[in-house]
Amino acid sequence: MPVLNLKSDLADADDLETLMAGIGRRARAAGRAMALAPAQTKDLGLRAIAEQIRTSAPAILRENARDVSAAQAAGLTNAIIDRLTLDEGRVAAIAEAVEKVAGLADPVGRQLAAFERPNGLLIERISVPLGVVGVIFESRPNVTADAGALCLKAGNAAILRAGSDSHRTATAIAAAMSEGLARAGLPADAIQLVPTRDRAAVGLMLTGLGGCVDVIVPRGGRSLVERVQAEAKVPVFAHLDGICHVYVAEGADLGMARSLLLNSKMRRTGICGAAETLLVDAAVAETHLKPLVEALLESGCAVRGDAATQAADPRVSAATDADWRTEYLDAIISAKVVDGLDAAIAHIEANGSHHTDAIITDDTNAAARFLNEVDSAIVTHNASTQFADGGEFGFGAEIGIATGRMHARGPVGVEQLTTFKYRVHGSGQTRP
């Protein structure tokens, strides 16, 4: 089976629409083959991909060095360059992550429900692949393998569009993946990386490529996600912001609250599951507010608060209205005192992003109300918001976090990259 040449004349094609249409058609054909591939064959393909990534490490690192050099010359931030940079250890980790996906249970062909109708019809609901998943990402080249492997495990084909910063590295990784698929007897076109930096290619992907793309997953900053959500003609699995709250309610143990707050905010400040707002119930503010604020400040976190929070510590600066709706992705948190559970829920509804919100309390009735009434993809009771992660949920890995209401919500793992069909078994029944 031929391996897709990602450095072919496609990259020089004058007609971008023709280029993208061809990618879409090949992905649709490959997706049909992947949908019928046995679980064992898919797993062999993923293990072959992991081995090929290891074999191709020198080539991947050479291309990565070119990307990093260009990023440095362009004056990109150290944070972006760190996300972009690979070394031997990171390449090995990419290969290992693909192998872990191979070890997950097959999400395809599972019987989700079965029932018999009074007329004798036997009806079952069975999980099936989505088809073709378009993944648009920015500077993290590991997304090429992570997202591609999850799509393949779920019996899908993937069209990957890397950001210009990571294009060379992503191309090398995608080439290794296509070679691994071909060695396992699977279609190399099940993984295709768009071979152009032209941003118009993103717009074409968002149209669905004439019905060839079934869902789009953006992995990147706010501007990318906003564009995808505004322009996409196909379903999108994404979240715009991660404005996550920690609500320290009446009945909260102070030691637990301190530990969970610091972990939710400071374990990693730059991820979407990091807490951005602290809400302290007025019933426990006298005993809990000051030590919690001090713990944040002493850990290196700046605090922007309401009048009550400012009164608790002179180092607290005044919060603006915008602070309650800001995803800092940094060692900054907004904090305020709320008058009870209803006020906390109302604040989250007005200012949150429906991502992940936590309540800390030993009051099981209050916790039950919070978990039921807060309209977020993930709600936690006495647990850190940073558990908002597919790996922590036991999904093995995730392609992203979705906060929409249709199909996938929360961590999007292999199970969420499937849909279902109904199989109806009869014995000659006709409808009266």
Swiss-Prot record:
Pathway annotation: Amino-acid biosynthesis; L-proline biosynthesis; L-glutamate 5-semialdehyde from L-glutamate: step 2/2
Assigned keywords, A-Z: Amino-acid biosynthesis, Cytoplasm, NADP, Oxidoreductase, Proline biosynthesis
Pfam families (alphabetical): Aldedh
Localisation: Cytoplasm
EC number: 1.2.1.41
GO cellular component, one term: cytoplasm
Principal location: cytoplasm
PROSITE patterns (alphabetical): PROA
Biological process annotations from GO: L-proline biosynthetic process
Annotated catalysed reactions: L-glutamate 5-semialdehyde + phosphate + NADP(+) = L-glutamyl 5-phosphate + NADPH + H(+)
Role according to the record: Catalyzes the NADPH-dependent reduction of L-glutamate 5-phosphate into L-glutamate 5-semialdehyde and phosphate. The product spontaneously undergoes cyclization to form 1-pyrroline-5-carboxylate.
Family: Belongs to the gamma-glutamyl phosphate reductase family.
Entry-linked HAMAP family: ProA
Protein name, as recorded: Gamma-glutamyl phosphate reductase
